């Protein structure tokens, strides 16, 4: 059962001290992160150093230029049986059934010579990209953005480590860049005169995506300013505000697992809004063989009750379960 969050408050936290060397300032940020993760489970990270206007420009340009044939050629196996990829690729809209479309890509370090690729390890794929003559700046931007977001997310994890009473670099080994299973999804929700049928929540709320817990270590999301997200609290579903320039951060189920739900994965859902908008999550994941032993965070009253779980097994089973529960995105 999901944890019902005690609050709907989503604070904005200046994370710039986490990039510096002032231990006292880092501790103050960690205290704010602690309050957010124990409150609504969400916070906005500001002063993050990412050019979000360029991000929107590149993604809008990409979605506007993609042809139907390009979308099919890049589509994952669920939409194109000729493509064996199940993670990297295009997630197509289906006329009359599904309006949302997206492109997901993985670690740029996953080349044919990467040991996990060579071994055919699940969840590892060499990225497919659209034609570089038609989309000249897309791949270079995306690869740079992936590395920038991995660095930002690793810095955030250092703040979470301090918030949990652990050494600052407690999570670093599990997040090594060359093996990271992290992913970026470039999701477009269109405005349509005639929208396909959408789901309805138990409370009557129309939904673009039903309630779920993120399969990640943490999720770091930028989205355009159309309010759509809700978090489940002890008082029911409550709206999460938007932000023009900041990243929305929440814990995924691996963080919940290793902290015994001290930092839970908040249950959340996407309201149906017929408006053109972008949702651009970075899902921070560890390497396939990474294992973080569950521990008792500083200040927690319970003992460790979860077993150690390799990140590869966690991710493979978690993503499969999410598709079974909520359908193919």
From Swiss-Prot:
Statement: the UniProt record of this protein carries the keyword Lipid biosynthesis:
no
Residues at which Fe(2+) binds? 212, 214, 268
* Biochemical pathway: Antibiotic biosynthesis; penicillin G biosynthesis; penicillin G from L-alpha-aminoadipate and L-cysteine and L-valine: step 2/3
Cite a single GO BP annotation. Answer: antibiotic biosynthetic process
Positions in coiled-coil regions: none
Q: Which Gene3D superfamilies does this chain map to? A: B-lactam Antibiotic, Isopenicillin N Synthase, Chain (2.60.120.330)
E.C. code: 1.21.3.1
The cofactors named for this UniProt entry are: Fe cation; L-ascorbate
Q: For N-[(5S)-5-amino-5-carboxypentanoyl]-L-cysteinyl-D-valine, which residues are the binding ones?
A: 87, 91, 183, 189, 212, 214, 279
Q: Which PROSITE patterns match?
A: FE2OG_OXY (PS51471), IPNS_1 (PS00185), IPNS_2 (PS00186)
| Every Fe2OG dioxygenase domain range | 180-286
Does the entry annotate any disulfide bonds, and if so which pairs? none
Checking SUPFAM superfamilies in the record gives:
Clavaminate synthase-like (SSF51197)
- Write out the residues that bind isopenicillin N: 87, 91, 183, 189, 279
Q: Which key words are in the record?
A: Antibiotic biosynthesis, Iron, Metal-binding, Oxidoreductase, Vitamin C
Where do the TM regions start and end? Answer: none
Name any one GO molecular function. Answer: iron ion binding
PANTHER family from the entry?
Answer: 2-OXOGLUTARATE (2OG) AND FE(II)-DEPENDENT OXYGENASE SUPERFAMILY PROTEIN-RELATED
Function text: Removes, in the presence of oxygen, 4 hydrogen atoms from delta-L-(alpha-aminoadipyl)-L-cysteinyl-D-valine (ACV) to form the azetidinone and thiazolidine rings of isopenicillin.
Q: Which family does it belong to?
A: Belongs to the iron/ascorbate-dependent oxidoreductase family.
Stated name of the protein: Isopenicillin N synthase
Look up and give the organism this protein is from: Streptomyces clavuligerus
Could you tell me the gene encoding this protein? pcbC
């Amino acid at each position: 059962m999901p944890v019902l969050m005690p609050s709907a408050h989503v604070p904005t936290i200046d994370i710039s001290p986490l990039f510096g060397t002032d231990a006292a300032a880092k501790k103050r940020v960690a205290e704010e992160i602690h309050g957010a993760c124990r409150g609504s489970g969400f916070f906005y990270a500001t002063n993050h150093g990412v050019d979000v206007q360029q991000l929107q420009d590149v993604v809008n340009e990409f979605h506007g230029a993609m042809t139907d044939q390009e979308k099919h050629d890049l589509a994952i196996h669920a939409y194109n049986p000729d493509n064996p990829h199940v993670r990297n690729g295009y997630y197509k809209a289906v006329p009359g059934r599904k309006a949302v479309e997206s492109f997901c890509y993985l670690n740029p370090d996953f080349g044919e010579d990467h040991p996990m690729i060579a071994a055919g390890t699940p969840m590892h794929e060499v990225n497919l990209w659209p034609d570089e003559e038609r989309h000249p700046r897309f791949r270079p931007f995306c690869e740079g953005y992936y590395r920038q977001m991995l660095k930002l997310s690793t810095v955030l994890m250092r703040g979470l480590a301090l918030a949990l009473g652990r050494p600052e670099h407690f999570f670093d080994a599990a997040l090594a860049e060359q093996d990271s299973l992290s992913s970026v999804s470039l999701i477009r929700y269109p405005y349509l005169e005639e929208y396909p049928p959408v789901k309805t929540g138990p409370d009557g709320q129309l939904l673009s995506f039903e309630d779920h817990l993120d399969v990640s270590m943490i999720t770091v999301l930028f989205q355009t300013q159309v309010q759509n997200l809700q978090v489940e609290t002890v008082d029911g579903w409550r709206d999460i505000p938007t932000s023009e320039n900041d990243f929305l951060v929440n814990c995924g189920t691996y963080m919940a697992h290793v902290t015994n739900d001290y930092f839970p994965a908040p249950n959340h859902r996407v309201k149906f809004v017929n408006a053109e908008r972008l949702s651009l999550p970075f899902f921070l994941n560890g390497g396939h063989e990474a294992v973080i032993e569950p521990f008792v965070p500083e200040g927690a009253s319970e003992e460790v009750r979860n077993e150690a779980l390799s990140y590869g097994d966690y991710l493979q089973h978690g993503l499969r379960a999410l598709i079974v529960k909520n359908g193919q995105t």
